[in-house]
Amino acid sequence: MDADTINSFFLIGALLIALSVLLSPVSSKLGIPILLVFLAVGMLAGEDGLGGILFDNYSIAYLVSNLALAIILLDGGMRTRVASFRVALWPSVSLATIGVAITTLLTGLMATWLFDLDLLQGILVGAIVGSTDAAAVFSLLKGRSLNERVGSTLEIESGTNDPMAVFLTVTLIAILSSTGTGLSAGFLALSFVKQFGIGALLGFAGGWVLWKVINRNQLPDGLYSILTVSGGLIIFALSNSLGGSGILSIYLVGLLLGNRPTRSRHSILHVLDGMTWLAQIGMFLVLGLLVTPSNLLSIAVPGLALAFGMILFARPISVWIGLLPFKSFTPREKWFVSWVGLRGAVPIILAVFPMMAGLPDAQLYFNLAFFVVMVSLIVQGGTLTKAMSLAKVELPPKPEPISRTGVEIYPTSEWELFIYRLKADKWCIGEPLRSLSMPEGTRIAAVFRNQELLHPSGSTRLEEDDTLCVLAQEKDLAALSLLFSEAPEKASLTRFFGDFFLDIEVKLADVAMMYGLNLGYELQDKTLSNIVEEQLGSTPVLGDQFEWQGLQWVIADVVDHQVTKVGLRLPNEEEEGEEED
């Protein structure tokens, strides 16, 4: 490769990345996932597109995709709160194992019939597209206010279900090739245990070692993110080499680093944010270049049937069976979880396996995987907002600071500087600073007005467009958001948590007359917490609702995983009119 070729490679690569970035706003205008834009740019630059670039190197595509996926999962793990495992761990594990197996089987049966394949070939297609994709799920759910039970289940499932899909894919390839003659049930069981066991062990152990190394070494600030990524990739590669799941390992590494006091954590997250975007762009550009759109035309009709069969039939059945033991999920939540079974890069990466193994019909498997991914991103990803509304899993948006920066004055500092800009509909406009009920231990470090720094006192009144710099910790974010909150834009969300709020420990007898409750003798001594547990079980989350005594009750506040307030929503004329219609 001469200098001109290398320079052309840099020029084309940089142009494609820049074009992807500049076209990214199109996704919000058209209501399509941004990942689809990156994929489309790759396809337009490819063999059948305007660019005419011929790219068919599956080994390079496999390398780029795995590297990108590892970075995306490391970042996703660091941003996942361990607290979410309280309500979502076991449902996620069930979906990541039983759910993937059921989806694989049902999709495989459809593929066998639609494409006249052998049963094992059809099930291989099912295994390739059987798992949800972490890159797609993390990207589409980022910044959305979702019921914790649902959002956490989807994120943890997408980060942990790849080992099952990889295990099934590799096993079926071995059976279909000459190397599968010596396979036994014991060997398969051992392989399954190795995938999950080694992946989990190296993820936790390697993550703990990396955490110690980061905290014990004093380095220039910019090197901590490089150490984190390189350490994560070492564990990712080592896990794969030992027969484990590198994908699971690096997700757990991120989870451990993100939930422990890690030196320069905020700086690491800022760098990872940019690296994750670059990884997503690079991965989907390469996968777009790899496909030949003209080859998809011949499978368009049966491919659509397979994609919609998986979306409307296989995925919902697998979710309902997988979540059967978990009574806390409502039918609406199960429906939403089944709808957000997004497919992305992972199925396309798994479709490269048969190509590299030289299996017959490998090109068909790849084209089918690509087709299913495109349909999933367009149909499921494009309707996500509407699905949230229909399933009623959307929570009122929590006002976020316009900027937040770590104040890392010592290695394990949890202090941050939150920046808020006050708009006209902020409820604290016109209030003197002394009247603000700031969370204990927090301070307003600075106030800017008309781009000038003020010297505020307790009598300083806040005005529209003031910028506040607040020194606090992440645990204070909810209280600060409430203090500097603005009215929800959607009218349907203004009464979401109720018209009146009751303490969870209030006695029913004390409020029965006020709210028209009809209490029998057995309810006289009960508290509201008893009713909540009877209706929602022991792990309710913010936004959970139930109807009791003709009224709608909503979990309105949760502190340290304990319900503290319940909202009472009274029926109004508009709601009654809608019900009559």
UniProtKB/Swiss-Prot annotation:
Alphabetized SMART domains for the sequence: CorC_HlyC (SM01091)
Keywords: Antiport, Cell inner membrane, Cell membrane, Ion transport, Membrane, Potassium, Potassium transport, Transmembrane, Transmembrane helix, Transport
Topology versus the membrane: Multi-pass membrane protein
Main subcellular location of this protein, as a coarse class: membrane
Annotated control of activity: May function more efficiently in K(+) concentrations higher than 10 mM.
InterPro entries named among the record's database cross-references: Cation/H_exchanger_TM, FAD-bd_PCMH-like_sf, FAD-bd_PCMH_sub2, Na+/solute_symporter_sf, NhaP2, RCK_C, RCK_C_sf, Transptr-assoc_dom
A Pfam match: CorC_HlyC
Cellular component, GO, one term: plasma membrane
UniProt superkingdom: Bacteria
HAMAP family: NhaP2
Function according to Swiss-Prot or TrEMBL: K(+)/H(+) antiporter that extrudes potassium in exchange for external protons and maintains the internal concentration of potassium under toxic levels.
Protein name, per record: K(+)/H(+) antiporter NhaP2
Species name: Vibrio parahaemolyticus serotype O3:K6 (strain RIMD 2210633)
Organism lineage string: Bacteria, Pseudomonadati, Pseudomonadota, Gammaproteobacteria, Vibrionales
